[in-house]
A protein has these predicted regions:
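Residue-level detector of alpha-helix initiation sites
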Residues: 24, 172-173
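Conserved active-site-proximal phosphate/metal-binding subdomains
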Residues: 151-167, 173-314
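Active-site entrance/lid segments in N-terminal catalytic domains of soluble metabolic enzymes
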Residues: 1-165
């Protein structure tokens, strides 16, 4: 049985987080992952308080297991969403796209476990000082908004820099990746891309088919000129965006291009105009499975690898 101290800290059975993917990580997927023993996460994205409250209620109708909410700090509704997670007694809050320091005192006082996603040692240290329960160290292999440091390089540096549990994210798709993360000092993993093709994931069929057909070179990162790089599957949209970026388009022009592109991919399956966020491990995702099958495969695979590695030690 694969269990780390982080499992006891959060009350979960398996050290697997499902990434809080905007327009994708809803009550359907999150409840299934939590029921499977991992930590399912609802993405609050740019939604308002009422939408999030409805999603929390829907999830609780499906499971009584621990779950989390991903709060995107750049959202215009961040303040009201930050209050909803308190009012609804959400067990875990995962934050992204910014520094959560302004909310952490209130969340901690409410008994919420706060786990920021970080892409640097500096931010990891800052949130640890402010009372974070753990951090997700997310490497540049991830889909969506990314930093510049790989998971292999980032995770051990964050582990050495803070005295709280570290969850590894980016480039993890099977038990080998989970085992590698543990060897780097992580106590858990967060994964998004493989869950895109879970049976309970409500993303568009076009999106799922693109992930299943992807290989090791199917993603590209754009938006570095804006300071907010994003990794997605190559598509007409990413080609057009990269062309505009290379031609010197302003941050405002690029922002206008990107507005609504993820929704067009996730909900409409719009190949021409959608941004299909996806990690570099998409080439390893080649079958549809239930969330439970995915979680079990990760854990069973990691156990097999970790036990086998001991045979190399004389």
């Amino acid at each position: 049985m694969l269990k780390t101290p982080l499992c006891d800290l959060l009350g979960i059975e398996k050290p697997v987080f499902q990434g809080g993917m905007a327009w994708i990580a809803d009550a359907s997927l999150a409840s299934a992952v939590s029921e499977a023993g991992g930590l399912g996460i609802i993405a609050a994205m740019n939604a308002d308080a009422n939408w999030l409250r409805d999603q929390i209620h829907e999830l609780r109708a499906k499971t009584d297991k621990p779950f989390g909410v991903n709060v995107m700090l750049m959202s215009p509704f961040a303040d009201e969403v930050a209050q909803v997670v308190i009012d609804e007694r959400v067990p875990v809050v995962v934050t992204g796209a910014g520094n959560p320091a302004k909310y952490m005192k209130a969340w901690n006082e409410a008994g919420i476990k706060v786990i920021p996603v970080v892409a640097s040692v500096a931010l990891a240290r800052l949130v640890a000082r402010r009372g974070a329960t753990a951090v997700v160290a997310e490497g540049a292999e991830s889909g969506g908004h990314i930093g510049e440091t790989s998971t292999m390089a980032l995770v051990p540096q964050v582990v050495d820099a803070v005295d709280i549990p570290v969850v590894a994210a980016g480039g993890i798709a099977d038990g080998r990746g989970v085992a590698a993360a543990f060897m780097l000092g992580a106590e858990g993993v967060q994964m998004g891309t493989r869950f895109l093709v879970a049976d309970e994931c409500t993303v568009s069929e076009q999106y799922k088919e693109m992930v299943l057909k992807a290989n090791d070179t199917s993603t590209r990162a754009t938006g570095r000129s804006t300071g907010h790089p994003v990794r997605a599957l190559k598509s007409p949209f990413t080609n057009a965006y990269a062309k505009s970026e290379g031609s010197g388009a302003s941050a405002e022009e690029l922002g206008a291009m990107g507005t609504g592109a993820l929704r067009k991919a996730a909900k409409d399956g719009n190949y021409e105009e959608g941004s299909f966020l996806c990690g570099q491990i998409a080439g390893m995702v080649n079958e549809r499975q239930s969330a439970r099958e995915i979680v079990d495969d990760l854990v069973d695979g990691a156990e097999h690898v970790l036990k086998g590695a001991c045979a190399w030690v004389a």
